[in-house]
Each structure stands twice: as structure tokens, then as C-alpha cells.
A protein has these predicted regions:
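Accessory carbohydrate-recognition regions in carbohydrate-active enzymes
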Residues: 51-486, 490-547, 560-581, 587-590, ...
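N-terminal secretory signal peptides
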Residues: 1-18, 25-29, 41-43
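C-terminal segment of N-terminal export signals and the immediately downstream linker at the start
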Residues: 12-13, 34-63
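Extracellular attachment/recognition segments
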Residues: 774
Length: 828
């Protein structure tokens, strides 16, 4: 029986959680590794995945990355065109396959379309200009464009989608029949993956219903389309729909449109969604003037003349093409600031009607970004998996300034150029773990600006708190903790100092001692300080909040220590030990307890009680990255810890009351959820580096180069960066320290370019293969390496790491305490 709403639950949230839990066992699908998972997810294998060994050898790096990877299963990726860290992501919004299990009423269906697209779909609604990469939240989808042909899909509306509820699914079985019929399509179109292709900065698809070939590319702030219509037929109109009412789970509360001419429009829309108050401005131009322009405002249709202005909540427009005018090009400038900003962005980034040149220039940007790593593999499919994940790791965060530097702040006001690139779409709870360290290695020029963004957001929010999940000038306050503190610390430790460190520390301190009132965070942190943990009878997610806050307070303490603030350091370090207060020695797990100290009873470690966030007790009990040695002590020493940790990977994968986002299971380890990402690397802290090598390979096998190739929500690059770093042979357990724990490299050879100095760090894995997963011997710069970790400074300096791999483990390597990764230690 579903539980009753808790104190922290609204009725709506309780209803949503109850529904997802009820459906979880059916919807989550089996917990399957790698190929078996893809096999179950029928239809998930794009043509690009059918590679043979050697096929990609010698291909330009741009052709090795496949944006379609991760667009199915639970990856929540979009396949469309974007520039590195671009604000515009021009991509199809899709819907509806003929599959009963797929079309679930309400949040489940929407959640599977967080990026606007899912590979299982067979219908495209149109192409919108803004998307979120791999997140578990849904928003954006601004300024949708769709070609239409009379008698095929000419319509003002997107048609109807039949969404089945769970009772209908039970009645129909596994085959629901056709979700759409042609009369219900509206302006949507059927499509086939056989006629769809993507590479970084470019996307194309054949729209079957109107018989239109659609292509698109993007720059940082602009999008460009090219549409090839069928040969004109007398009396049959061809046109282009522009839908300002379309959105991804966001509601338009105000919109404006100006028809400046028959080939140029401009406007804005304001939405309520995950981002509570978002404003988007655009300028759109056509390569050929339209023969007619019609506008629908809240259902009333009128012919528009140059200079016509419209306002309302639901504004749509149809351009009627001039017959026999050739391919239609469309260019769109986007701005979060103003119409003037959108026009300036368009003029600066796409000044001419040369689609191929924009594709070329954006491709060059991607080539430069992807070429920071030069990696080779024995299998070309692994190479494509690798570079696809590098690509995904370079999509977010998004640059949030106009070309003149102006931006919309967290205070809801427009601001002039702050002197740096302002960023948005920062999934901090996710990316602090691996994505941000990944960026410090591959994109160091962006690191100081990301930190400046965090501090500026703190100042403009005026909430006594650093941001948690900023999205388009809105703080969503999503997830838990204040992990921006660890990001600032991690940047500082790695030598990034071109920001106001005193202002940054003031932001960390204020967040730690006061915190945001939003979502009850201030009260939650007060509970943490008062009780020494977050009581589960007072707040949902008490165990996970306790663990995350322990890390955050440790981060504040480490930052204070580095700045010579001894009293603060002692205070925060003490709070960083609060994780011990939710460890129940009787069960051997991190466990919920009430304000009176009573442990949750009954208790099962494989059940998703409300004490945990994106985890159960198995997965949460190892979330102490700042004090792994302390965690080992709680378990009774090295041997007991290794046994417990191995139990995580070998336990049955069933999770009771699992939400649909519990994915990527290896035993009870859930790679699809971020709290599990560091688990394979913990063995090395107890002197069992060979087990880190084994289990990191097992988890990496969940990834592949298909649409189902990412084992969960990518969350703005976190799961992708995990694979990239793991394939290179290392991963940061405590992301703030600049320490990377060595694992088992997938690369045969790789070099990492430091863009700041031009130096290269080379990794060689001799005798590497799918069977030879164990390090026999390691050398750093020609000298034998006995320890199982490297520092950020070593990885960003010219050097060579040479592994000799083998089939049997070298159980003596890196076993001495001095050779194990430091826990909570920040190297000079």
C-alpha cells in the first residue's frame, strides 16, 4: 500500500511519487548490462552503431562523435545541432511511438522527453531552439519551427497524442496499436531513423508526411535551418509554422510577435516552468519573402501585414512560401536579454545566407574542442562511444551572455557585460563530481568564469546561498546540499585563482551558516547543525542530505584552512564528520533516524525509502568522498570494507519501490544515478586497487555507441564525463582535491592537451584488451609508479603514464598505506 504524504510533501508531489513507484517495477525494465540492455530496448540501435573494427580509424575526430548516442533509454539526450557550450540547441521535439509500455499518462511520458526527443519516437512535432542536455527535469523548447504542406500536415495545431494510463495498458497488453493516425497529426510528421543523421553541430532528417528534407546547424546564440520542399503543385500551399505556444512542460503566460516584413519577424515569450520566470527573445529571417503571413492569437486567425504587432498567450504564425523559390533557409537569433540583443547575436554569428559555411565553422569549433584528447582504441565502436561522451561533456553549461556581454541576472534584471562569460544550465549536484573536473582538464579557460558565475549568482540571488541548479536566469533550487562550495574549492586547489577568492569564501560561509529559505534549505541546514544529522521524521531525504551536507561543510572547512581562517575551518570540519551519525553499526548501512535518535524500522537496504535521494541504503552508504578512511574505520578496517563494497556490486539488483530513474545496475550499484559514480574507485583506498580495476571495467561496459548507450540521465555531462575519465584510466573520488584515482584504462593510447600551455600528458596501456583489465605494472615518466593516484598538476604537465595490462590481477600493487589515494588530503 502506498505510504501517506510526508511532512515535506505537497499532495501533488505525493501523488506523482506514488504513481511512479507503483509503475516502477513495470516501467524500469530489467536490470541488464550493456548489450543485453540494448537488446531489450528494441529499436534502439541506430545505423551508426553497426560498425566493424577499423571502420573509424583515420576518420576526422568530428566523425567519431555521434550525438544520437544516449537519445534513447534513459539518457535524455537531444540529437540536434549545438555549438560547444552554446545557448542554442536546435533539435527536434518528438513524440509518440506505437508502444503501450511507452505512452504512460502524465509525468512518466514527459520525463522521458526531458530533452524534447526520445529515440523510440516516430513522430516529430517540430524543431525548437533550446534544450537541456540529459537532465532529469524538463523545460525550454522555445520557438518551434515546422515545415508544412497543404493536404499533408498543414495545420495550426500539433494534433493529438493518445496517452494511455496504466489501466489501459493492463487491458491492452504490450501492444497498444497506433498512437497517431494521419488525421490527428496536425503539423507533426512521421519520420524514420533510416533517414536521420547527426554529427556535432549538424542534424538532418527526412520528414515523411510533408516530404521535406530538414537540416539544421547552430552557433552559440543562433540557429540556422535549411528545408528542401517537394516540387510545387498548383493550388497546394507550402509553408512554415512558427509556434510560440509550444514548450517542454512550461506554460507561456505572455508572448509578443512583430511581423517586420514578409521575411522577418521578431518577438518574445515568457514562461513558467521548472525555471519559474523565463524570458526568451528572438529574431527570425527567411531567405525568401513569404507570399503570405497569417497569425493565430489565442485561436483568432488574421492576415498579417508588415508592421503588425500581436500579443497573447498562444501565438502561432504560418509563412506561405513563394512557389518555386528553392530551398528555404531560416536563421534565428536568440537572446535572454532583449530583442536588440537577439538581432545583434544574429548579425554577429550568422551574417550571411551560407548554411554550409555555418556548418563548417561550428564543425571547426567542435573539432578544436574534441581534439583536446587524442585517443585510440582496438575497437572502433569503443572509440565512437568515447568521443560521443566527450562531445556530450562539452555541451553544457551554456554561455548566457549576448555577444555584447549583456545577460539577465538571477535578480530578474538585465545587466551589462560583467567582463567574463556568464554561464547557465549548471546541474551542480551532478556535475561537481566528474564533469567539472573533466572541464578543468579539457576546458581550463572556462573554469574561472564558471566560478565567477557561481559567486555572481550568489550575490544577485540575495538568498544567503550559492546557486544549486541555475537555468536561464532562474535558480530552480533543485536537489540537495550546496556543492558549489566544492566546485569553488576544486578550482582553487587546481590553481585557478582568477576570481575574487574572498568574495567566493564569503559566499561559501554565508551559505553554510545561513542558507536559502527556498525549499526549506535554511531550516534543513539548521536541523543538520542542531541534531548532527537531518531527522527522517522531519524531512524527506534525511540520510542523503546528511551525507551531502557533511561533504559540503568539509569543503567549506578546507577552503577556510587554505585561506588561514582557522576558527572557521575547525567549525566546518567538525560538521563534516556528521555523516557518522547516520551510520547504524547494527545493520552496517547509512540509515534514517528520527529526531529522537530511533533508527528506521522496519528497514531494508534495497528499498527506496524517502530517506534517500537517487539511491537506496546500499548506494548511499558509501557517499563519504571527503573521508574515505573514516568510512573504512566505521566498517571495521580494510578487509571488512572491501567485503562490504564488493557486496554492493554482487547483491541482487532488485530495488523495492524503485523510481523509474534507477538504472545502470551492477548488483546494487546504480551507475545511472550520481551517488554511485565513485563506487568502483573506493577499493583503492583500502589497498585493493585490483578490484577498482575490475569493477570500473564492469560498470564501463554499460556504455556503448547506440541510442541506448548511456545507462541513465546524463545530467549535463556527468555520466558522459565519468566514461571519458574512466576510459583514460582515472576518476576523482573527491572532486575537490585534485586527486584522480587510477582504474583500468580502456584506451590503448591517449594524449591530453593542456590548452593553456600546449603540453601533453600521454597514457599508454600496453597489452590492453577486454580480458586484460588488470594493471601489472605502472610507470610515470619512466619511473615505476607504486601508488594508485595522480594529481591534477601531474595530468596537466608534460609526461607519460605507462600501464602494462594483464589477465590476472596484481594484488600487491598499491597496497601500502602510503601508496593509496589520500582521503580528504589536498596536495600542494
Amino acid at each position: 500500500m502506498p505510504e501517506k504524504p510526508g511532512k515535506a510533501d505537497s499532495p501533488e508531489r505525493w501523488k506523482r511519487r506514488t504513481f511512479l513507484k507503483t509503475c516502477g517495477a513495470v516501467l524500469a525494465g530489467p536490470s541488464l548490462p550493456g548489450a543485453a540492455l540494448a537488446e531489450w530496448w528494441a529499436g534502439e540501435l541506430p545505423a551508426q552503431s553497426q560498425t566493424s573494427a577499423d571502420k573509424s580509424r583515420g576518420r576526422p575526430v568530428l566523425e567519431r562523435a555521434n550525438p544520437i548516442v544516449g537519445t534513447g533509454w534513459r539518457g535524455h539526450m537531444f540529437p540536434g545541432a549545438a555549438a560547444p557550450f552554446g545557448l542554442v540547441q536546435l533539435s527536434p521535439d518528438s513524440s509518440g511511438p506505437p508502444d503501450a509500455k511507452w505512452n504512460i499518462q502524465g509525468d512518466w511520458y514527459e520525463w522521458q522527453h526531458c530533452s524534447g526527443y526520445n529515440y523510440r519516437d516516430n513522430v516529430i512535432s517540430g524543431f525548437s531552439h533550446t534544450h537541456i542536455q540529459g537532465a532529469g527535469g524538463i523545460d525550454l523548447g522555445d520557438v518551434l519551427v515546422m515545415p508544412v504542406v497543404e493536404g499533408k500536415n498543414w495545420s495550426w495545431d500539433p494534433g493529438k497524442i493518445e496517452v494511455l494510463n496504466e489501466m489501459q495498458i493492463a487491458a491492452l497488453g504490450t501492444d497498444a496499436g497506433i498512437v497517431f493516425s494521419p488525421s490527428e497529426l496536425g503539423y507533426r510528421s512521421f519520420f524514420s531513423h533510416e533517414h536521420e543523421s547527426a554529427r556535432p553541430g549538424y542534424y538532418s532528417v527526412h520528414l515523411q508526411t510533408p516530404d521535406v528534407q530538414a537540416e539544421m546547424t547552430a552557433t552559440t546564440r543562433c540557429g540556422m535551418h535549411r528545408y528542401q520542399y517537394p516540387a510545387a503543385t498548383a493550388g497546394v500551399r507550402q509553408g512554415l509554422v512558427v509556434d510560440l505556444a509550444h514548450g517542454l512542460n512550461c506554460r507561456v503566460y505572455a508572448a509578443e510577435l512583430t511581423v517586420e516584413s514578409s521575411g522577418r519577424i521578431s518577438g518574445q515569450r515568457s514562461t513558467h516552468g521548472w525555471a519559474q520566470d523565463r524570458h526568451v527573445y528572438f529574431v527570425m529571417e527567411l531567405s525568401h519573402p513569404a507570399a503570405a503571413v497569417e497569425v493565430s492569437v489565442d485561436g483568432a486567425i488574421a492576415t498579417a501585414q508588415p508592421g503588425s504587432e500581436f500579443s497573447g498567450k498562444e501565438i502561432k504564425l504560418i509563412f506561405t512560401r513563394t512557389p518555386a523559390s528553392g530551398p528555404l533557409l531560416v536563421r534565428v537569433g536568440i537572446s535572454p536579454v532583449s530583442l536588440e540583443g537577439a538581432a545583434k547575436n544574429l548579425q554577429a554569428e550568422i551574417p550571411a545566407w551560407d548554411f554550409d559555411e555555418v556548418v563548417h565553422q561550428t564543425g571547426r569549433s567542435w573539432t578544436d574542442a574534441l581534439s583536446t584528447i587524442d585517443a585510440s582504441f582496438s575497437q572502433s565502436s569503443t572509440e565512437e562511444t568515447f568521443y560521443s561522451n566527450v562531445y556530450h561533456g562539452l555541451v553544457a553549461p551554456a554561455a548566457y551572455n549576448d555577444t555584447d556581454g549583456a545577460f539577465r541576472g538571477q535578480d530578474g534584471q538585465n545587466h551589462p557585460n560583467p567582463g567574463f562569460t556568464k554561464y547557465t544550465t549548471l546541474s551542480i549536484w551532478d556535475i561537481y563530481r566528474g564533469e567539472f573536473p573533466f572541464l578543468t582538464l579539457l576546458q581550463p579557460r572556462r573554469v574561472n568564469d564558471i566560478v565567477r558565475t557561481l559567486v555572481l549568482d550568489y550575490q544577485q540571488l540575495d538568498q544567503h546561498a550559492l546557486p544549486m541548479w541555475p537555468l536561464w536566469g532562474n535558480e530552480t533550487w533543485s536537489m540537495i546540499g550546496f556543492h558549489a562550495a566544492g566546485m569553488i574549492l576544486g578550482a582553487y586547489v587546481r590553481g585557478f585563482r582568477d576570481f575574487d577568492i574572498e568574495a567566493a569564501y564569503a559566499a561559501i560561509r554565508d551559505t553554510a551558516l545561513v542558507g536559502a529559505e527556498a525549499r526549506g534549505n535554511r531550516a534543513l541546514q539548521a536541523m543538520f547543525r542542531q541534531y548532527g544529522y537531518v531527522p527522517s521524521d522531519l524531512r524527506e531525504g534525511g540520510v542523503s542530505s546528511t551525507l551531502d551536507l557533511s561533504y559540503d561543510y568539509w569543503s567549506a572547512g578546507a577552503m577556510a584552512e587554505l585561506l588561514g581562517k582557522k576558527d572557521d575551518s575547525a567549525m566546518f570540519y567538525k560538521l563534516g564528520q556528521n555523516y557518522k551519525n547516520v551510520f547504524n553499526p547494527a545493520t552496517g548501512f547509512m540509515q534514517g533516524r528520527s529526531k529522537n535518535g530511533k533508527w528506521r524500522d522496519p528497514f531494508r537496504p534495497d528499498q527506496e525509502f524517502d530517506d534517500y535521494v537517487e539511491s537506496d541504503a546500499w548506494q548511499a552508504s558509501f557517499s563519504v568522498p571527503h573521508d574515505v578512511q573514516g568510512l573504512i574505520s566505521l566498517y571495521g578496517g580494510d578487509a571488512a570494507f572491501v567485503d562490504k563494497l564488493e557486496g554492493l556490486f554482487t547483491a541482487p539488483s532488485r530495488v523495492i519501490d524503485a523510481r523509474p530513474d534507477v538504472t545502470g545496475m551492477v548488483g546494487q550499484d546504480a551507475q545511472g544515478n550520481e551517488p554511485s559514480n565513485h563506487h568502483p574507485y573506493l577499493f583503492s583506498f583500502a589497498g585493493a586497487a585490483w578490484k577498482t580495476q575490475y569493477w570500473s571495467r564492469e560498470v564501463a561496459a554499460l556504455y556503448n555507441n547506440t541510442a541506448a548507450g548511456i545507462p541513465g540521465n546524463d545530467d549535463c555531462g556527468q555520466l558522459s564525463s565519468w566514461f571519458v575519465l574512466t576510459a583514460l584510466g582515472f576518476y576523482p573520488v573527491n572532486a575537490a582535491t585534485g586527486v584522480y584515482v587510477l582504474g583500468s584504462p580502456l584506451v590503448d593510447r591517449a594524449s591530453i592537451l593542456n590548452p593553456l600551455t600546449g603540453s601533453k600528458f600521454t597514457i599508454i596501456a600496453e597489452n590492453n584488451s577486454a580480458e586484460n583489465v588488470f594493471i601489472q605494472r605502472a610507470e610515470l615518466n619512466g619511473k615505476e609508479l607504486h601508488r594508485s593516484w595522480l594529481s591534477h598538476q601531474q595530468l596537466t604537465t608534460a609526461g607519460e603514464l605507462h600501464f602494462r595490462m594483464g589477465r590476472t590481477p596484481n594484488k600487491d600493487w598499491a597496497t601500502a598505506p602510503a601508496d593509496r589515494p589520500p582521503s580528504g588530503f589536498i596536495p600542494a
